[in-house]
Amino acid sequence: MRSSASRLSSFSSRDSLWNRMPDQISVSEFIAETTEDYNSPTTSSFTTRLHNCRNTVTLLEEALDQDRTALQKVKKSVKAIYNSGQDHVQNEENYAQVLDKFGSNFLSRDNPDLGTAFVKFSTLTKELSTLLKNLLQGLSHNVIFTLDSLLKGDLKGVKGDLKKPFDKAWKDYETKFTKIEKEKREHAKQHGMIRTEITGAEIAEEMEKERRLFQLQMCEYLIKVNEIKTKKGVDLLQNLIKYYHAQCNFFQDGLKTADKLKQYIEKLAADLYNIKQTQDEEKKQLTALRDLIKSSLQLDPKEVGGLYVASRANSSRRDSQSRQGGYSMHQLQGNKEYGSEKKGFLLKKSDGIRKVWQRRKCAVKNGILTISHATSNRQPAKLNLLTCQVKPNAEDKKSFDLISHNRTYHFQAEDEQDYIAWISVLTNSKEEALTMAFRGEQSTGENSLEDLTKAIIEDVQRLPGNDICCDCGSSEPTWLSTNLGILTCIECSGIHREMGVHISRIQSLELDKLGTSELLLAKNVGNNSFNDIMEANLPSPSPKPTPSSDMTVRKEYITAKYVDHRFSRKTCASSSAKLNELLEAIKSRDLLALIQVYAEGVELMEPLLEPGQELGETALHLAVRTADQTSLHLVDFLVQNCGNLDKQTSVGNTVLHYCSMYGKPECLKLLLRSKPTVDIVNQNGETALDIAKRLKATQCEDLLSQAKSGKFNPHVHVEYEWNLRQDEMDESDDDLDDKPSPIKKERSPRPQSFCHSSSISPQDKLALPGFSTPRDKQRLSYGAFTNQIFASTSTDLPTSPTSEAPPLPPRNAGKGPTGPPSTLPLGTQTSSGSSTLSKKRPPPPPPGHKRTLSDPPSPLPHGPPNKGAIPWGNDVGPLSSSKTANKFEGLSQQASTSSAKTALGPRVLPKLPQKVALRKTETSHHLSLDRTNIPPETFQKSSQLTELPQKPPLGELPPKPVELAPKPQVGELPPKPGELPPKPQLGDLPPKPQLSDLPPKPQMKDLPPKPQLGDLLAKSQAGDVSAKVQPPSEVTQRSHTGDLSPNVQSRDAIQKQASEDSNDLTPTLPETPVPLPRKINTGKNKVRRVKTIYDCQADNDDELTFIEGEVIIVTGEEDQEWWIGHIEGQPERKGVFPVSFVHILSD
């Protein structure tokens, strides 16, 4: 028995009833054993189960104690809900009461509609409050009362109180048993016997009373436990069911109550819109009246009074500043004798709890206050005085405050004289910096990097549309959205700031010190290009604000434009289509295409559909992996406009890992500006810094180390091909009179003039002239392409890169030349359906060799990897004496050759008699690359204006390398194998004229200004070397060959003559005679006449509408792509017209 008691003490409180141990007894077993003992005490085995009863009671007591603790916590939580609900009901009743009173005020002030609405909402609140009160009563009656009854009744007290009667009965039984056991052993000892064990049967009769008491207390305890089980289980759950029904009734009744007002609420919403419109109109009229009164009074704001000051505070400060005529500092005026620079010591009050004065070394220079720290290893703090205000302390004559944009500095000078000096220097330095900023000047200590930044900003401001605000059209915007690349006015920029940096990040071009990395998008987007996408679907009437619009109108429009993308063009129907467009935009390096998919709501950091270097690559991974110094703007746009820079590929590599793996320090700079997580590891357990160290990428390692230590400067410079505008152009003296203005009027884009083969890769498309976007053409300068090689599929001279001219007719798939034509100096062979962009250059001509039309262009140094324009200021090629010629002179050859070729193969013009003179073209190939926006017709016209239409005497011809034989007749020329294209379908072409229609030897004056297509085709079919065949679709619309001037035909005639008569050269590389010397321009002032070759419908009021075949008298030039003139004989029909839509008449 003692051992049983000791075992009971080892039980853990964690044991539970449903995890009974073997020495416990169940209720059914207790009943059976007790009944048996009651009927037959001597044969019963109940005494052996006494220990089990004791163990069972102990474990039951522990379980009840655990339940008591849990139910007390439940009761506490429910009471808290009830109390807070009562408070909520009381607050709702108060709210309903004051709302009803407020509505009554409206009813008494001739606003019955608004008053009724407030009263109805008050009634609704009261009804809902009543329902909530009923719900809380149900909670109190069903849950709280039940828990209170249980905890204060059956479970009252502490652990062990319930089993005290049982413990007493157990103790009495054990005492009596010990006493009888001792007596039996003594009795046996007296008779010389030893009793080792006493059975229950022997003492059954003697212990019956104590055993019956034990059984009674055990039975009482089990009955009590059973009652508690019922109350804490079944009864409590039944009351929770009642509360559940009360909750259901609460929500159902609440919904019914709210539905009663549904129709009224819908009608009220419409009425409120009309009321708001009326009130807005009143406000607008009052605002206009206020501004009118203010302008007439010219009062200082302090004299106007509190009402005006309050209205100023509520209105936009930016709006009020923009209406001021000039800037007035309204601040301290320092003593100019102290200058604007000073070094010394000041006492600065610390920001800690103690607020102690600390002595700090300070310096003022170039508008910057430098405050050194106590330790020399920390970088000093630098404050831009332009954004600070100096405020003297009225209480202490030696103290003053410096209020910056984010904190206030408290300074104290050593004495009053030193105080005056510091105040004066700070004020003078700030005033000096402000004056320099307003005048556009810079400090004397600027370096080349600041010069570059200034040049970039100037170039950005010259982009199309950047002279007005992107949102409201205000002139001269100076606030830049660095993540969108657009310029806004100060009023609209304030709304951009309110939207948050995840939508638009605003910086000032004048007040902020920008790094070149913050100008990447501004250099490549521009307001016009951005609005072509984001405002493509503006409704009519347009909701776009004007410069005079108030802030409410601006905010509604800007939010719809930038947050909702409500006015953008939609081109993709599904998310997969958007991802495909995103992939193509990155591959083709097309920023505008990227902005288009961004406007359509694509998730920029979604894994791309096409597998890349690693599974799970995003567009940013791909952009970084393929980035170079020409595509950083794509990386910048993705970095600034995507949400999560920590996206990982399938192997755990983030974009930072890619920068280290592929050695992209410039991309890394752009990424670190947005503060991504730098310590993410991939599957190999490496961070981006670990990879940079392993691969010895020192630049990436340094940048990542700076970012990890928090020392990275976000205003960082990036190495990028800026392609800035060149101010000093390589031009002759004759050009100075006609030099166009650097800022051009932007017009609606015309069809592109470059046709490309489908085999061109997306990366190479950007290098092709036809793929230059209007914004690129507007900002690239005269010399931007002097060092550039445009690789096309068929040309020995680059086609004009302008996109303003109509498209050239493409070659049909089955009509390409089958062999290398004789006039293809680059050795290019074109197939029927595909072409290549890699051209092999021939060796340069030997020294002394004169340049002719059949020679290839001079080898130019290769441009940067993007095949775009390389940095400005470089010249190439040997310069001849004709360098100072008219700027259109050297491009006359390009006008003839490029216009006579398709995108799939060269087109050789029909030959003309050799009497027609050629110009000297020593620098034609060089100059043909200079102008990027001038169509071929422009140069053709200029060349005709600058030369006398007469033939030089034969004696002036230079020596010829090969003597030319007499010119054979057309019918005597047999076709050469490989030179003739397949015969065109005659059914698709106009009737062929007879050969007799062609003059045998036309003079310059006899040449028609516009030969017919039939004449040229007749020559081609009769045996002339010609690779030019127009598609039937183009022939039916217009005669493209008719665009060529007689000079063009004469040049090709001599070129073809040379190829036929040279016997010592191969057919594919003919030798041509040296062209005739160039004549001096003496007819520069003659009237210029042009003939229209296409129909043109005016897009703007000042443009000229015409049809094909009309003659226009040129009266001026708006810029190099748009001329001014009127229809011949109809001077009332005048306006500007595109040069690429006309053909210059030679007269």
Swiss-Prot record:
It is found in: Cytoplasm; Membrane; Golgi apparatus; Golgi apparatus, trans-Golgi network. Pfam families: Ank_2 (PF12796), ArfGap (PF01412), BAR_3 (PF16746), PH (PF00169), SH3_9 (PF14604). Residues 738-749, 919-929 have a biased composition (Basic and acidic residues). Activity stimulated by phosphatidylinositol 4,5-bisphosphate (PIP2). GO terms for molecular function: GTPase activator activity; phosphatidylinositol-3,4,5-trisphosphate binding; phosphatidylinositol-4,5-bisphosphate binding; phosphatidylserine binding; SH3 domain binding; zinc ion binding. Residues 339-431 form the PH domain. The modification Phosphotyrosine is found at Y308. PROSITE patterns: ANK_REP_REGION, ANK_REPEAT, ARFGAP, PH_DOMAIN, SH3. The modification Phosphoserine is found at S732, S741, S854, S858, S1026, S1045, S1059, S1146. The modification Phosphothreonine is found at T1066. CDD domains: ArfGap_ASAP1, BAR_ASAP1, PH_ASAP, SH3_ASAP1. Keywords: ANK repeat, Cilium biogenesis/degradation, Cytoplasm, Golgi apparatus, GTPase activation, Membrane, Metal-binding, Phosphoprotein, Repeat, SH3 domain, Zinc, Zinc-finger. GO terms for cellular component: cell projection membrane; cytosol; dendritic spine; glutamatergic synapse; Golgi membrane; plasma membrane; podosome; trans-Golgi network membrane. Residues 310-333, 725-775, 792-1080 are annotated as: Disordered. Residues 750-762, 1033-1052 have a biased composition (Polar residues). Residues 728-737 have a biased composition (Acidic residues). Residues 950-961, 974-984 have a biased composition (Pro residues). Phosphorylated on tyrosine residues by SRC. A zinc finger (C4-type) spans 469-492. ANK repeats lie at residues 615-647, 651-680. Homodimer. Interacts with SRC and CRK. Interacts with RAB11FIP3. Interacts with PTK2B/PYK2. Interacts with REPS2; the interaction is direct. Forms a complex containing RAB11A, ASAP1, RAB3IP, RAP11FIP3 and ARF4; the complex promotes preciliary trafficking; the complex binds to RHO in photoreceptor cells and promotes RHO ciliary transport. May function as a signal transduction protein involved in the differentiation of fibroblasts into adipocytes and possibly other cell types. Possesses phosphatidylinositol 4,5-bisphosphate-dependent GTPase-activating protein activity for ARF1 (ADP ribosylation factor 1) and ARF5 and a lesser activity towards ARF6. May coordinate membrane trafficking with cell growth or actin cytoskeleton remodeling by binding to both SRC and PIP2. The PH domain most probably contributes to the phosphoinositide-dependent regulation of ADP ribosylation factors. This is Arf-GAP with SH3 domain, ANK repeat and PH domain-containing protein 1.
